[in-house]
Amino acid sequence: MPKVAVGGTFQYFHDGHAKLIEKAFEIAEDGKVHIGLTSDEMLSKSHSVDNYEKRRNWLLQYIKEMGIPDDRYEITKLNDPYGPALEEDFDYIIVSPETYPVALKMNRIREEKGKKLLEIVYVEYVMAEDGIPISSTRIAKGEIDRHGRLKKNIKHCNTKN
């Protein structure tokens, strides 16, 4: 049974995150998916990010909605970009264009340590309605919702009576 790793911050759990998680379970078949969730300490985003527990709860909610049994996955806290994937015997790592370079570096380090290389499964970005990738940053800026739908700009006028 394949052992699959996937990781991320998973802020504003959106359709791009869903695609990564779905691909991880598809590749794992009946094996186990190890999900690395970025710790609060590791974050340095240009926008505020919810705490670890809140992001973990969004992730768990989605996995439960998929109907995945508890024994098919494990969520671990990532305190560095690699997490357990440098040491443990994973078969696959699921990546987005953003995390692909990290997976390449991870395989170089694994090779230096004499470990089996991870098979990298590359998942393309999910595009918003405007053809630009869905991202947590765009959601934080109010440009799109979690499904990539454009938000209408509403102008507020102050009127004095």
Swiss-Prot record:
Q: What is its main location?
A: cytoplasm
Q: Give the location in the cell.
A: Cytoplasm
Question: From the Swiss-Prot or TrEMBL record, what is one GO molecular function term?
Answer: pantetheine-phosphate adenylyltransferase activity
Query: Could you tell me the keywords of this UniProt record?
Result: ATP-binding, Coenzyme A biosynthesis, Cytoplasm, Nucleotide-binding, Nucleotidyltransferase, Transferase
Q: Which cysteines are joined by disulfide bonds?
A: none
Query: What Pfam families does the annotation carry?
Result: CTP_transf_like (PF01467)
Matches recorded under InterPro entries: Cyt_trans-like (IPR004821), PPAT_arch (IPR023540), Rossmann-like_a/b/a_fold (IPR014729)
Task: Tell me which GO cellular component terms the UniProt record holds.
Answer: cytoplasm
Q: Which reaction does it catalyse?
A: (R)-4'-phosphopantetheine + ATP + H(+) = 3'-dephospho-CoA + diphosphate
Query: What Gene3D superfamilies does its record include?
Result: HUPs
Top-rank lineage group of the source organism:
Archaea
- The top EC class is transferase
This enzyme's EC code(s): 2.7.7.3
BP-aspect Gene Ontology terms: coenzyme A biosynthetic process
Pathway assigned in UniProt: Cofactor biosynthesis; coenzyme A biosynthesis
Stated role? Reversibly transfers an adenylyl group from ATP to 4'-phosphopantetheine, yielding dephospho-CoA (dPCoA) and pyrophosphate.
Q: Which family does it belong to?
A: Belongs to the eukaryotic CoaD family.
- HAMAP family assigned to the protein according to its UniProt record, in alphabetical order: PPAT_arch
What name does the UniProt record give this protein? Phosphopantetheine adenylyltransferase
Protein species of origin: Methanosarcina barkeri (strain Fusaro / DSM 804)
Gene name tied to this protein: coaD
